[in-house]
Amino acid sequence: MSEAKVGIFVDYESPLARRVAGDVWSGLSRAALEAGFTKTTAHWESLREVRTPTEGPSVHVFAIGQDRPDAIDAVGAVGDPGAPHLYGVIVAVPGKPSPLAGSLLYQGVERLTGTGVKAGMVEPALLHAVPAECERYARRLLERLGSS
């Protein structure tokens, strides 16, 4: 294995999403190094701006904060929805999540599958801004990447 490339789309207007995205990236970079990748790069973009398809990333992560639920409307396939990309959909939640957080997560998955992304290529998660929790999710993404 040589390089792991990740596209990270963050709702920068949400403090929750920013913190969780940073913790997930830290976890991804550590897990990739342990998995034998010699280089790990991330292309960070604002979720609320026009998306620029980038060549290479096999994983695209969307980080939305429970505090800014309208950002879910910006979730969508990157490039060809039929391409073998793995998608991470994260709803960042505070210590006590809203009962609607699960519905928000479901909407994010539906926005991807509605554009043609296979449901099996989406890894959804409700995450707190807790490094250990985010790292477990990051490791799961890398495991899924290795098996896809």
Predicted features by range, described:
Residues 2-27, 39-148:
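Intrinsically disordered, low-complexity regulatory regions enriched in serine/threonine/proline
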